[in-house]
């Protein structure tokens, strides 16, 4: 058995149980690590390792003076995830103790470690303990003032109602300006697909209400009109960057599963949480091997919402519906189909929903109906052809309404996103040139690819376009064969006339050049795509060049799993494509 990924859990997490309902210091923190099978190992070896681990942890904890009660061992098909609750001012020592107990139990570490020294660990624990910090956090919880704690300092309150102290500085309770500290309205957004678009919709709605908005996503951090960071900031670091900024009056935070699994939920006590959907993507990390386990991870943000807040869920996702009963905050469902059984039952029980009724985005609460905006007036919905973006618009509308945004702000936010690069960065970008239609979409998992291609098929049917369908695809090297099979099945179901499989340079993740495209080609053939219509490309620009050279007026090109945005943009400009 191998030991891997020892880490601190600094917020609400899927391993150490916390009561539903955010705020008030209810989240249980601690430390965790993975125990992974070596080749040929199985449950028997794990049984033995767990027995020894519990004994070694108890003995070492007693020697060091660290409580070790409440060890959690969650088994999965590649081993187990181990978690230990610990006080916030003991986490660094606790991770050392847990890791050492694992080594003493016979688990092989990922790197050499020095001999265990219980006396040194005990001294480290005493140095780490910080009664002033504990008292401060207890007082903040009593006053319902949110706290953010990390290596770069501690902050109390959020946004314009926050104060931050640098690393090593912990103020006395009496020195804190408590009357100036508190919450700002926060929306958390997660899900397998639609996170970024929904977050962008929400940020647009907030801006339209006239407030300074902090937003995070896989595209960066934006405060007001300033792009503070670029790249993927959908983890805890992005949330801290926004909520420690004293300009921020409202926040829309994309919350990816990676950060939830590595560190826990950074923000406890948000006003609203949105879970768009859960499907097959990123399985296998940190012991999450099936969609049900992933749903539990995604729903962490729902349990972190204040009891007087709101949780927005997809009525068409049975995994989310099944978990709604355990959420402390009220539920609002969204659905394209206003007659969906979950929607009908929820309304009958007095619950709120956001649906499409007679072509109009509509909020329903009991007998009251509020018409928001016709789908035809939401650019990214393409008259309803982009069903996935209709769902994103519904989710954002429900969340914005729950935060108290006025209807005109909801409308402005829905109109604000258009199919251009600056707005969407590779999500549902549709362009046309000389009779050829091009879709650039980040879709990279089976559900996302199926949704993107279904959208194109609806556009083609609506516009009576008889031409061919050319699909460009690829994958990162860490994608499982199950994920690749699902993506290839979705491509095959669209009956493409030409498929170009490209290498994603920089994303091979340990695979040899050509290895991933060869796997994709094999899965495409098994799914029913004729070998003669499959070509290979060296990268994004090469693949798109092949596709556009082949395309004729009336044809549709779908470039999925879009990576090299600037390079593709330059290529299209050089070929005369309008932005």
Task: Indicate where each model-derived feature is located.
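Short polybasic amphipathic segments
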Residues: 153-158, 219-223, 359-366
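Walker A (P-loop) phosphate-binding motif
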Residues: 175-219, 227
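ATP-dependent carboxylate-amine ligase
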Residues: 1-64, 68-71, 76-78, 386, ...
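Residue-level signal for inorganic ion chemistry
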Residues: 140, 216, 254, 276, ...
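Preference for protein termini
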Residues: 1-185, 208-209, 213
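Adenine nucleotide phosphate-binding catalytic loops in nucleotide-utilizing enzymes
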Residues: 288-295, 299, 329-450
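Gly-rich Lys/Arg/Thr-decorated short loops/hinges at beta-loop-alpha junctions or inter-strand turns
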Residues: 182-186, 215-224, 271-283, 375-377, ...
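Flexible active-site lid/hinge loop adjacent to a nucleotide/diphosphate
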Residues: 223-333, 338-342, 377-382
């Amino acid at each position: 058995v191998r030991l891997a990924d020892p880490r601190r859990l600094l917020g609400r997490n899927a391993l150490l149980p916390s009561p539903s309902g955010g705020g008030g210091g209810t989240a249980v923190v601690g430390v965790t690590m993975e125990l992974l099978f070596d080749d040929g190992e199985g449950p028997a070896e794990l049984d033995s390792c767990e027995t020894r681990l519990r004994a070694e942890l108890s003995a070492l904890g007693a020697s060091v003076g660290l409580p070790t009660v409440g060890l959690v061992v969650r088994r999965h098909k590649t081993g187990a995830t181990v978690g230990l609750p610990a006080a916030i001012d003991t986490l660094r020592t606790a991770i050392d103790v847990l890791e050492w107990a694992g080594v003493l139990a016979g688990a092989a570490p990922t790197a050499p470690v020095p001999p265990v020294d219980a006396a040194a660990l005990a001294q480290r624990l005493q140095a780490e303990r910080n009664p002033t910090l504990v008292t401060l956090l207890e007082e903040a919880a009593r006053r319902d003032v949110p706290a953010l704690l990390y290596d770069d300092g501690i902050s109390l309150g959020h946004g314009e109602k926050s104060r931050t102290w640098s690393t090593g500085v912990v103020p006395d309770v009496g020195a804190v300006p408590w009357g100036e500290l508190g919450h700002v309205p926060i929306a958390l957004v997660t899900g397998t697909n639609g996170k970024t678009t929904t977050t962008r919709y929400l940020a647009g709605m907030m801006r339209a209400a006239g407030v300074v908005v902090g937003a995070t996503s896989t595209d960066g951090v934006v405060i007001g009109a300033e792009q503070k960071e670029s790249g993927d900031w959908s983890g805890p670091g992005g949330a801290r960057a926004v909520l420690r900024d004293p300009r921020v009056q409202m926040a829309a935070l994309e919350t990816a599963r990676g950060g939830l699994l590595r560190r826990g939920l950074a923000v406890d006590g948000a006003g609203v949480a949105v879970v768009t959907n859960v499907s097959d993507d990123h399985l296998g990390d940190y012991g999450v091997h099936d969609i049900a386990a992933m749903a539990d991870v995604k729903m962490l943000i729902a349990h972190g919402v204040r009891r007087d807040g709101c949780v927005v869920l997809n009525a068409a996702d049975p995994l989310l519906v099944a978990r709604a009963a355990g959420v402390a905050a009220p539920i609002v469902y969204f659905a394209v189909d206003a007659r969906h059984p979950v929607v009908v039952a929820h309304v009958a029980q007095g619950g709120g929903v956001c649906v499409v009724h007679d072509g109009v985005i509509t909020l329903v609460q009991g007998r009251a109906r509020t018409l928001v905006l016709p789908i035809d007036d939401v650019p990214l919905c393409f008259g309803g052809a982009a069903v996935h973006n209709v769902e994103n618009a519904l989710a954002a509308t429900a969340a914005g309404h729950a935060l108290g945004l006025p209807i005109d702000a909801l409308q402005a936010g829905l109109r604000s996103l258009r199919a251009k690069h600056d707005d969407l960065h590779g999500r549902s970008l549709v362009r046309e040139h000389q009779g050829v239609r091009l879709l650039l979409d980040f879709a990279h998992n089976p559900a996302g690819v199926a949704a993107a291609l279904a959208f194109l098929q609806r556009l083609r049917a609506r516009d009576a376009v008889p031409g061919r369908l050319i699909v460009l695809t690829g994958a990162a090297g860490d994608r499982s064969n199950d994920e690749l099979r699902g993506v290839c099945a979705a491509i095959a179901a669209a009956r493409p006339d030409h498929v170009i499989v490209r290498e994603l340079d920089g994303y091979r993740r340990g695979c040899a050049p050509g290895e991933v495209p060869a796997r994709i080609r094999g899965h495409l053939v098994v799914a029913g795509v004729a070998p003669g219509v499959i070509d290979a490309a060296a990268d994004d620009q090469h693949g798109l060049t092949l596709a556009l050279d082949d395309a004729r007026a009336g044809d549709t090109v779908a470039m999925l799993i879009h990576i090299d945005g600037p390079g593709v943009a330059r290529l299209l400009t050089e070929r005369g494509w309008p932005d």
